[in-house]
């Protein structure tokens, strides 16, 4: 497949917490869709190795959710570094989207961009500076048309790939039910 500037890159990170100054990335996943939100390809889903000491610093919420999902065990067993994750992800993305063409797409994507700026700058620079943030639409629909919100429910697994898939499905829902296009 040739790279297409109209394709969209969807990304999700799982982190040890919400503060990039003290927390780190522990999982990354990407998907590429066409402009109509049809999934074209799944990128590598990578658990990034972190030390036991780093993982022990996670708060209770993160310990619980990342423990239940099996992510903590995958991170401990992983041999992948942040550099490996950057390299593999960019290699995948370059097949589908030229550098600088796609906005960063996902839910609460500003948070992911903060961590990419801190830990994975080369990957962050692959994206256009704009964002397609599904959570922005969700917040507006919640306020302007709350009854519409009943039509879509997320599982909230806090696993990067599943979260991206849900973000795409959520935007497809808003496109049909809110934008009617």
Curated annotation (Swiss-Prot):
CDD domains in the cross-refs: Orn (cd06135)
PANTHER family: OLIGORIBONUCLEASE, MITOCHONDRIAL
Entry keyword DNA-binding: no
Pfam family, one: RNase_T
GO BP term, example: DNA metabolic process
InterPro entries named among the record's database cross-references: Exonuclease_RNaseT/DNA_pol3 (IPR013520), Oligoribonuclease (IPR022894), RNaseH-like_sf (IPR012337), RNaseH_sf (IPR036397)
Keywords: Cytoplasm, Exonuclease, Hydrolase, Nuclease
A Gene Ontology cellular-component term: cytoplasm
Function statement: 3'-to-5' exoribonuclease specific for small oligoribonucleotides.
Protein name: Oligoribonuclease
Family affiliation: Belongs to the oligoribonuclease family.
